[in-house]
A protein has these predicted regions:
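Short, well-formed alpha-helical segments that are part of the catalytic scaffolds
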Residues: 13-26
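Conserved donor NDP-sugar-binding/catalytic core segment of glycosyltransferases
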Residues: 100-133
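Glycine-rich, basic loop-to-helix element that forms the pyrophosphate-binding segment
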Residues: 66-83
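Non-catalytic, C-terminal membrane-associated alpha-helical segments of glycosyltransferases
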Residues: 228, 242-338
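Short aromatic/hydrophobic "clamp" motif used to bind/position activated sugar donors
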Residues: 88
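Short beta-strand/loop segment that forms part of the nucleotide-sugar
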Residues: 32-42, 63-65
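A recurrent flexible, glycine/aromatic-enriched loop bordering the glycosyltransferase active site
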Residues: 149-169, 185
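Acidic donor-binding loop at a coil-to-helix junction in glycosyltransferase catalytic cores
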Residues: 185-192
Length: 338
């Protein structure tokens, strides 16, 4: 029988995280271990203080890192290295399983030996607005599907879509492909999904596996999130240069506007257009971030730590360990000429 570990990165977890753990423990296919990669211990300790959490959930392992250490790709990769199962289910702290068959349904996708990763359907919360509810339906339809390189021509960038808000990975395939990129602002799941497709493996979308997960972001938040998305695509032209996301975005806006008209919500169309404009503006700025002043980037990003880490990583490549000091521009030029 296959063994399964769960990985959950957390930062300032709340009651949804506790509900998530409780529902994971009630699954028809139980996880062997639940690995929590927590950023900033004080917030985690504050949540579980006096709850006997660790006594209640013996299979939960918690590892603490600082906010400065966190990276969307590297932190998840560190967690994967700690797993021992045949499969690893990655979730976010605010994704709540709808029923007790989440793991069972995701695991069923791997009956096809070519499937490297399977992701779940995300349903909106009861508090979600009309636009967010339709967006979830657009991105996570009621019909399951399996995607391969053959789908690139008609699905375009959606071939690579695979959200690790709730996604299960075949560990052998993950290791074969090198895992998540180790330094990224965002979008590590899609970057890895592209490697899956390009290597000949498949991605399964399991509509039967469901979690409640949605966000009603403000226009400013949408702009900043899509700025980070644009940065991730600009940093990986080998993946995204050949596929356009613009057509998919236009399709979403058009279909959402049509839906609002049909359901008597015409008053929300203006809000939709403003929100979509903020998304697109953020995305374009992110795609062209190398042309922007650093102070702009600091205002536009949701992930300031990424840029701090990025600067440190770039600086470390300039260190000559044989001399003990940073290389000058002249020394770098001489080395290239050699």
């Amino acid at each position: 029988m296959s063994s399964i570990d769960v990985v959950i990165p957390t930062y300032k977890p709340d009651d949804k995280f506790l509900t998530l753990i409780e529902r994971l423990e009630r699954q028809t296919v139980k996880p062997d271990r639940i690995i929590v990669m927590n950023t900033e211990q004080k917030y985690y300790d504050r949540l579980i203080y006096g709850s006997h959490f660790q006594d209640k959930y013996k299979n939960v392992e918690v590892y603490h890192i600082s906010k400065r250490e966190f990276d969307h790709g590297r932190t998840r990769h560190m967690a994967m290295k700690r797993t021992q199962g045949d499969f690893a289910l990655f979730m976010t702290q605010d994704a709540v399983p709808v029923d007790e068959k989440l793991i069972e349904e995701l695991l069923a996708a791997f009956q096809d030996g070519a499937v490297a990763v399977a992701y779940a359907r995300q349903l909106p919360s009861k508090e979600s607005g009309v636009i967010e509810r339709y967006t979830r339906e657009f991105n996570y339809p009621v019909v399951s599907m399996v995607k391969s390189a053959d789908d690139l021509e008609h699905l375009g960038i959606k071939t690579y879509f695979c959200s690790n808000v709730c996604a299960m990975y075949r560990k052998s395939a993950y290791e074969e492909l090198g895992g998540f990129v180790k330094h990224t602002i965002f979008n590590e799941d899609m970057i890895f999904a592209a490697a899956v497709i390009k290597s000949g493996y498949k991605i399964a979308y399991r509509a039967e596996a469901q979690v409640v997960h949605s966000h009603d972001f403000t226009n400013r938040e949408q702009l900043k999130r899509n700025f980070d998305l644009g940065v991730s695509q600009a940093d990986h032209p080998e993946i995204f240069a050949g596929v356009s996301s613009g057509a998919e975005g236009k399709k979403l806006v058009k279909q959402t506007a049509d839906y609002l008209r049909k359901t008597g919500n015409r008053r929300l169309i203006g809000r939709l257009y403003i929100q979509s404009g903020c998304k697109y503006m953020g995305y374009l700025l992110g795609k062209n971030y190398k042309k922007l002043p650093k102070r702009w980037i600091a205002c536009l990003t949701t992930n300031k730590e990424f840029w701090d880490n990025d600067n440190r990583m770039k600086a470390s490549t300039r260190i000559d360990v044989t001399k003990g000091y940073g290389k000058t521009e002249e020394e770098q030029k001489m080395r290239k000429e050699k």
